[in-house]
Swiss-Prot record:
It is found in: Nucleus. ATP binds at residues 22, 63, 127-132. It comes from Nematostella vectensis. Keywords: ATP-binding, mRNA processing, Nucleotide-binding, Nucleus. GO terms for molecular function: ATP binding; polynucleotide 5'-hydroxyl-kinase activity. CDD domains: SIMIBI (cd01983). HAMAP family: Clp1. One of its GO terms (biological process) is mRNA 3'-end processing. Required for endonucleolytic cleavage during polyadenylation-dependent pre-mRNA 3'-end formation. Belongs to the Clp1 family. Clp1 subfamily. This is Protein CLP1 homolog. GO terms for cellular component: mRNA cleavage factor complex; nucleus. It comes from the Eukaryota.
């Protein structure tokens, strides 16, 4: 039975956890952080081990689960919305899944020829813990000495970079408990929306492009090849959402699909792929918190703020003017027009991935811009990765300049910029 302490407590609290027990914690909103210290035993947070007697700081609104396999004692100081223990946790099932994937990696290791390790896709509706399960599986793999690739197709949260982006990252160390996986040198593409719905064709095109790059990495890196990849997906699982799941599963040649919570999706995918793909149905954790639309918006804003200022506000972004004449601004996707108005031989799908020049206006204020890695228009800007992001803080049409917030000082490394529908108001 769960024991709960539901009070915004400021005092220092100690918790003693028995083996196979989880302490679920929600830090209160506001301006006070919570500090967690492992006093004895062993414990982990989403697959990353806690270091004994080290202070870990969690920001207001943080939600985490401290799990122990053998038992432990932890101390928490700071304002908590909720803190309770539970022995009803799917962690043993998640560990069994990891061990099955590890056996696949061992088989791939033994082949002298290049043998692909597990390509795992985690799917399910919103708020079932997909990102957490992906983080667990990746952390466990890295702790075994593997080098898996983390693939993020969830444009709503954008854990590979910023919301509205898709990407992949080769992992060499477990996620930092406070800051997550190190995002040095990720492969990132701009989708530009927080849901796949505005542009299914572009979403599928970028999924396929990332899959191609991942397989190229597998060919060059035998360790990464045997380690495989773990793919996080959006929480849309019906209609177009289901179609993009199937497309991504095919593009990445997935051999394991983990379905969290929803039996209907599990059965649909079993019928779709038959015996070609192992479909695994797992329960969601009881600690998963349902997020409101407002909460999701706040998380996206915090993600963008962290990109420019750092998780602990330890980065100092640069603000400077950029002349309109020094850059070329585009957006991906032209407005839909009646089929009768399209040029001969063209379909609506081509409009969805068309590169459209953008004339700077006051509407650019607060917009997120991606810096394309392309050096000329002869390259396909739509399918070229991006190397960074800017936010437009001001637009001066008389002087033909815009003031941007940038992680790096001037000058800009490239001149081709892609417009996103994501907006960020920098009140720092």
């Amino acid at each position: 039975m769960d024991t709960e302490q539901d009070a915004k407590s400021e005092e220092r609290q100690q918790w003693k956890l028995e083996k196979d027990t989880e302490l679920r914690v929600e830090v209160a909103e506001g301006d006070r952080e919570a500090i967690i210290v492992l006093l004895s035993g062993n414990a982990e947070v989403f697959g990353t081990e806690l270091v004994k007697n080290k202070k870990f700081t969690f920001r207001p609104g943080s939600k985490l689960a401290i799990f122990t396999w053998q038992g432990c004692s932890v101390e928490i100081q700071g304002p908590l919305e909720v803190a309770y223990k539970s022995k009803e946790t799917p962690m043993v099932m998640y560990l069994n899944l990891h061990m099955a994937l590890e056996q696949m990696r061992e088989r791939a290791d033994k082949h002298e020829a290049v043998e692909l390790g597990p390509r795992v896709m985690v799917v399910g509706p919103t708020d079932v813990g997909k990102s957490t399960v992906c983080q667990l599986l990746l952390n466990y793999a890295v702790r075994m000495g593997r080098r898996p690739i983390s693939v993020d197709l969830d444009v709503g949260q954008g854990t590979a970079s910023v919301p509205g982006s898709m990407g992949a990252l080769l992992l060499e160390r477990p996620a930092d408990i406070e800051e997550g996986f190190s995002l040095q040198a990720p492969l990132v593409y701009l989708f530009g929306h927080t849901s796949p719905s505005p542009n299914e064709k572009l979403y599928n095109m970028l999924s396929s492009k990332i899959a191609d790059i991942v397989f190229q990495r597998f060919e060059r890196n035998k360790k990464a090849c045997a380690s495989g990849c773990v793919i996080n997906t959006c929480g849309w699982v019906t209609g177009m959402g289901y179609r993009i799941i199937v497309h991504a599963a095919t593009a990445f040649k997935v051999n394991v699909i983990v379905v969290l919570d929803q039996e209907r999706l599990y059965n649909d995918l079993k019928n779709q792929f038959g015996d070609k793909v192992q479909i695994v149905h797992l329960p969601k954790s009881g600690g998963v918190v349902v997020r409101s639309r407002e909460t999701r918006r706040k998380v996206r804003d915090e993600r963008l703020r962290s990109y420019f200022y750092g998780q602990q506000a330890n980065l100092y972004p640069h603000s400077f003017e950029v002349k309109f004449s020094d850059v070329k601004l585009f957006k991906i996707g032209a407005p839909l027009v009646p089929d009768s108005c399209l040029p001969l031989g063209m379909d609506q799908g081509q409009n969805e991935t068309k590169l459209v020049p953008v004339v700077p206006t006051k509407d650019l204020k607060h917009c997120l811009l991606a810096i394309s890695a392309a050096e000329s228009l002869e390259e396909d800007l739509v399918q070229t990765n991006v190397i960074g992001f800017l936010v437009v803080n001001e637009v001066d049409l008389d002087r033909e300049v815009m003031v941007v917030l940038s992680p790096a000082p001037r000058p800009l490394p490239r001149k081709f910029l892609l417009l996103s529908e994501i907006k960020f108001m920098d009140f720092k």
